[in-house]
């Protein structure tokens, strides 16, 4: 646990803050647009679910990229922190940032009197965890930021057309489907854990 805390301390200031800020801004964009455009509940749900999916990609697609990789190398060399804890600490910190961002968006919806505000906090976080986990896994395997962003974007586009199975759709509330997003959230956590596992065992780029 002390190694994990040290890894988070080393990594937090220089690597994760801008990604978390980008996610927060994207999350808050949907309620603000809904407020200005006088959207219906279903239209607002679609906007929030779309924004949260994009926020997950923004926060996690750059998880393993070169400038952050150099920071990991320095932390491991200087402090003797195990490699996997640095990647895991970064992923956990960004998941926490996504949860806070999702709750902030839900509070903004509630302030507008929206009937879907509480549901959107969990739905938005599940979307962000899934698309972010998918982006991180693509990044770990490919080493390409473009591919890491492209595959979740493709999933997003196909899903928006209604072609994804209901248990894995990003747009449960927008499509008026029953059930919750627990399977989507768990799939996102699994993808993110697999991404950290893969990255830990791949050699650093020179």
Question: What residue spans do the PLM features occupy?
Answer:
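Hydrophobic alpha-helical transmembrane segments
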Residues: 1-50, 55-67, 129, 137-143, ...
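Selective transmembrane-helix segments that form parts of the transport pathway or gating/packing helices
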Residues: 16, 81-110
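Juxtamembrane "helix-exit" motif on the non-cytosolic side of transmembrane helices
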Residues: 30-39, 105-114, 162-172
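Short alpha-helical transmembrane interface motifs in multi-pass membrane proteins
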Residues: 53-58, 89, 115-120
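Helix-loop-helix units of permease transmembrane domains in multi-pass membrane transporters
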Residues: 62-93
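Residue-level recognition of membrane-helix boundary sites in multi-pass small-molecule transporters
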Residues: 85, 146-147
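Membrane-interfacial helix-loop-helix connectors in multipass membrane proteins
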Residues: 104-130
């Amino acid at each position: 646990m002390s190694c994990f805390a040290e890894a988070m301390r080393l990594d937090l200031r220089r690597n994760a803050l801008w990604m978390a800020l980008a996610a927060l801004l994207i999350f808050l964009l949907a309620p603000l647009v809904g407020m200005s455009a006088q959207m219906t509940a279903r239209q607002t749900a679609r906007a929030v679910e779309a924004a949260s999916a994009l926020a997950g990609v923004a926060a996690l697609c750059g998880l393993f990229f070169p400038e952050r990789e150099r920071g990991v190398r320095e932390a491991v060399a200087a402090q003797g922190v195990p490699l996997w804890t640095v990647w895991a600490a970064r992923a956990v910190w960004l998941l926490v940032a996504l949860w806070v961002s999702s709750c902030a968006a839900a509070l903004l919806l509630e302030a507008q009197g929206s009937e879907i505000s509480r549901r959107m906090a969990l739905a938005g976080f599940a979307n962000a965890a899934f698309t972010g986990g998918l982006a991180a896994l693509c990044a770990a395997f490919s080493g390409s930021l473009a591919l890491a962003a492209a595959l979740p974007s493709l999933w997003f586009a196909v899903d928006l057309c209604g072609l994804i199975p209901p248990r894995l759709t990003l747009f449960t509330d927008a499509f008026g489907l029953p059930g919750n997003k627990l399977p989507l959230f768990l799939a996102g956590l699994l993808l993110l854990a697999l991404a950290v596992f893969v990255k830990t065992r791949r050699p650093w780029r020179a």
